[in-house]
């Protein structure tokens, strides 16, 4: 008489239809849960690569570009219709603060909410998918009196956080804009929700 293992040729219980269904459902749920985290990690990795490439060029003399941006801001402050930006002016803006012709003019750091993303010219979808976008018709981000720079970024994207947690900032929180060889530190002085 032959003694067997007791299975008599039966499949393990997890290989039954029910076991496979449970395993597939578990893996599907795990994938759905991890997808936003993996995508955010990947996009932050891409943002960090772009910022590192930008920082490698920081050693060049950028004072002329900063001065040209400040002159643009002075002209902008005198305009009555600041938000109407003709195509030729956009062309000029696209070259200001972009010595490497990548479209990137700097990056924004908001430590409280873990934001460290590039700033690109314009608010077209291409720019907003790559980081924050500079709003044409507002001051270039080089500081100065009577200037007001507006940056836009997505919030609520599944694939990247970007400005999703912006509502967690409070009056007094600080953030920085790094543009060419200069770092500009700002403090939240008011919060308006519209």
Q: What is each PLM-predicted segment?
A:
Residues 1-15:
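N-terminal Lys/Arg-rich, disordered targeting/topogenic segments
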Residues 12-194:
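Solvent-exposed, non-transmembrane regions of membrane-associated and secreted proteins
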